[in-house]
Amino acid sequence: MFHGSIPALVTPFKNGAVDEAAFAALVERQIAAGSAALVPVGTTGETSTLSTEEHKRVVSLCVEVAAGRVPVIAGAGSNSTDEAIDLVAHAKAAGADAALVVSPYYNNPNQDGLFEHFRAINDAVALPVVLYNVPSRTVVDLKPETVARLARLPNIVGIKDATGDMDRVSYHSALIGDEEQFVQLSGDDPSALGFLAMGGAGCISVTANVAPELCAAMHLAFEDGDLESARAIERRLINLHRAMFCSPSPGPAKYALSRMGLCGPEVRLPLTAPDAAAEAMIDAAMALAGLNT
């Protein structure tokens, strides 16, 4: 269903407001570069500091600009089950192909609570849902056993796993079985190639905002069985992967895009822009990747 390089799109701002023209241009750039799908308003899209109206508008705009050329997996998570259902329902109404739903954060539910949260979403809206497990941000880990229970629900089609634990790919597969055709996507750029080798289908990527052609080429090389080329591309990208988190994300990605003249570097508080040392690290990583600024 979903595979390859999938950018977790930044949401550009200009003078405090969403820069719709810049966002539309970024979507066009991603499609031209060979990205396999698009994820608007996820963590990298600063969903936590968007108003509900802004969130929904960005999803609608992404679907409108993509115009069916690639799938749109709309960010739609919340620590309120009712709000998550509302966002998933909007994603469906807007024409998104799926919703990316993060585990509830801050309120720290147990595994039964996580299961019931996602089951409520599954039951409320007939739209494919990709689970999003990122315990470094949500505090709670969506355990493989819970993922396996959820995979048996009709609308739960996959997971974005940002734990960096590649054992999860095999463990999920062993628990779920092949008959479910459950899609596993990495949420950790530095380990994405290893994730693919373990049986993953793709990566929802921060780095792909900045280097979409290289990220797409790495995935295509792997899919073609050309591991030497895939590894060579990954070596070009590894410093950029690390630089994308040298300051709170998505500040580094936005700074890099601003250096390329593609959008402004503005982030919303409580995030702040990268400092001079971080900027130097990003510049160096871009140069090593062969990106023009």
UniProtKB/Swiss-Prot annotation:
BP terms from Gene Ontology: diaminopimelate biosynthetic process; lysine biosynthetic process via diaminopimelate
One GO cellular component, as annotated: cytosol
Gene Ontology molecular function: 4-hydroxy-tetrahydrodipicolinate synthase activity
Catalytic reaction equation(s): L-aspartate 4-semialdehyde + pyruvate = (2S,4S)-4-hydroxy-2,3,4,5-tetrahydrodipicolinate + H2O + H(+)
Superkingdom of the organism of origin: Bacteria
This protein's pathway: Amino-acid biosynthesis; L-lysine biosynthesis via DAP pathway; (S)-tetrahydrodipicolinate from L-aspartate: step 3/4
Keyword Zinc-finger (UniProt): no
Keyword tags: Amino-acid biosynthesis, Cytoplasm, Diaminopimelate biosynthesis, Lyase, Lysine biosynthesis, Schiff base
Subcellular location: Cytoplasm
Pfam (any one): DHDPS
Enzyme class, spelled out: lyase
Catalytic residues as annotated in Swiss-Prot or TrEMBL: Y132 (proton donor/acceptor), K160 (schiff-base intermediate with substrate)
Assigned EC number: 4.3.3.7
Site (Part of a proton relay during catalysis): residue numbering on this chain: T43, Y106
SUPFAM superfamilies: Aldolase
Residues that, per the record, bind pyruvate: T44, I204
Summary of subunit composition and partner proteins: Homotetramer; dimer of dimers.
Cited function: Catalyzes the condensation of (S)-aspartate-beta-semialdehyde [(S)-ASA] and pyruvate to 4-hydroxy-tetrahydrodipicolinate (HTPA).
Family assignment from sequence similarity: Belongs to the DapA family.
Record protein name field: 4-hydroxy-tetrahydrodipicolinate synthase
Naturally occurring in which organism (per UniProt): Hyphomonas neptunium (strain ATCC 15444)
